[in-house]
Amino acid sequence: MDDLKALIGKVATGATLTREEASCAFDSMMSGEATPSQMGGLLMALRVRGETVDEITGAVAAMRSKMLRVTAPADAVDVVGTGGDGSGSVNVSTCASFIVAGAGVPVAKHGNRALSSKSGAADCLAALGIKIDLTPEQVGRCVNEAGIGFMFAPSHHPAMKNVGPTRVELATRTIFNLLGPLSNPAGVTRQMVGVFSRQWVQPLAQVLKNLGSDSVWVVHGSDGLDEITLAGPTFVAALENGNIRSFEVTPEDAGLSRAHGDALKGGDAEANAASLRGVLEGRPGAFRDVALLNAAAALIVAGKAKTLKDGVAFGTTSLDSGAAMNKLKQLIAVSNG
């Protein structure tokens, strides 16, 4: 506790924490040792000053050390967004996950209920008939038998219950909004991560490199989407062979047409589930295109596709052959089994 007081004092002066200090501070919070006032003080001091790569790396390390782990294939990928982009869009990364799985790449998806929309990944999947409140062993069975599994964050991060009330009372974004997507319980090293602000694209790629990821795309759409957007360019930081490269991609790079964000407005969980099922059944339109675009990037991360156009071709086959829809049916069956 005295250590935590010293670290809060350090941050209060504007100084930054080392990776080890941040890990120690967040361990205190997640173990329930820190008081609500101490948690709130540290979280807001970090937020106002701006969190560093070392601080985020240390915080993620602390969170990962307490999570309930899932056993998944070494080549599994995660397609995940921070949420909180305020767009209220359809569940793009969730739909893309089924396309990726249908293309033969195992998916260990990590997610939660809605942040700023009416339907987060967990809400949408539950509305599709998938049982989301599973044990780590049951999720591992889904990934290994169905080729796709969903890890509901509260089930795998029980230590987060110690910081939950403080986060609710602060009612503003904190470092915890970044930690979830970086703390996949299956320990995947191939990740496609969407973030709510361009400022985090490069830093989060660096954090994932620090923590041992192999292949990563961190993305932010120029229209604010925490996915690759159809509306214009998307900012990307890609980790490949130990190097981070920053660039932009457009729908045209993937052979797709642009579409305004309004075409992707979502509704509640039932409406978003119906839209997702429609894409898997072959319905054309902006939702299909944006899901293909994001799946294409995930297939690059997985090492299956070389370019976005390649990835779209694999994704199109996954949809048109019925393979993606079959993955949904398999996940419903195995999760409820």
UniProtKB/Swiss-Prot annotation:
Pathway given in the UniProt record: Amino-acid biosynthesis; L-tryptophan biosynthesis; L-tryptophan from chorismate: step 2/5
Positions bound to anthranilate 1: 81, 112
What does the record's cofactor remark say about binding?
Binds 2 magnesium ions per monomer.
| One GO term of the biological process aspect | L-tryptophan biosynthetic process
GO CC annotation terms, alphabetical: cytosol
Reaction it catalyzes? N-(5-phospho-beta-D-ribosyl)anthranilate + diphosphate = 5-phospho-alpha-D-ribose 1-diphosphate + anthranilate
| Chain residues that bind Mg(2+) 2 | 226-227
List keywords of the entry alphabetically. Amino-acid biosynthesis, Aromatic amino acid biosynthesis, Glycosyltransferase, Magnesium, Metal-binding, Transferase, Tryptophan biosynthesis
* GO terms assigned for molecular function: anthranilate phosphoribosyltransferase activity; magnesium ion binding
Identify which cofactors the protein needs according to its UniProt entry: Mg(2+)
* Enzyme class, UniProt record, top EC level: transferase
What is known about its subunit structure?
Homodimer.
The name on file for this protein is Anthranilate phosphoribosyltransferase
Q: Give the organism the record lists.
A: Nitrobacter hamburgensis (strain DSM 10229 / NCIMB 13809 / X14)
Q: Highest lineage ranks of the organism?
A: Bacteria, Pseudomonadati, Pseudomonadota, Alphaproteobacteria, Hyphomicrobiales
